[in-house]
Amino acid sequence: MKRIIGILFAIIVLVSCNSQKVYSDFDISYSKNGGPSPIYENLLIKANNVHYSFEGQGKKIKKEFKLTNEDLKKLDNVLSQNNFRRIQEDRKKLYDNVTTSINVKKGPNEGSKTDASLVMPNYKTNWDNILNAFQEIINNNVKKQ
């Protein structure tokens, strides 16, 4: 009996640890959260596989889908053309603001940026172009309910 309980416990631990792996094992992440009426939106890309989740405004969406190599190349080009690595963040203190964070873990655009305290004005257009590229991926692959 103890052996069966031990095996069941080990299986439960392994399954629960594996379910969190999707949130740490990614190449590119896009995260939008916060605000007076909080929302939590995550887009995690690992190779061609994408995990999307949205929670807020009375909705809860989770979706897995694939991106083509062309889609990934297009996203990488947008990051490069808009100098993702050179975007400068402002240092203002903001509260109850919806913030967006982008984290690129590999490739020439490797880096992490957030607009939690806004982006410096001369980089605002670049930042908006990058956000639009991620939003286009979401709009093309996730049907909002």
Which role does the model predict for each range below?
Residues 15-16:
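C-terminal motif of bacterial Sec signal peptides marking the signal peptidase cleavage site
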Residues 62-89:
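Mature extracytoplasmic domains of secretory-pathway proteins
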Residues 19-35, 57, 85-145:
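Short, well-ordered, aromatic-rich surface patches in folded extracellular/luminal domains
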Residues 2-8:
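Sec-dependent signal peptide recognition
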Residues 35-66:
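Post-signal-peptide N-terminal segment of Sec-exported extracytoplasmic proteins
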Residues 11-12:
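Repetitive helical segments and hydrophobic/amphipathic motifs
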Residues 2, 47-48, 66-68, 103-106, ...:
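Solvent-exposed, well-ordered amphipathic alpha-helical segments
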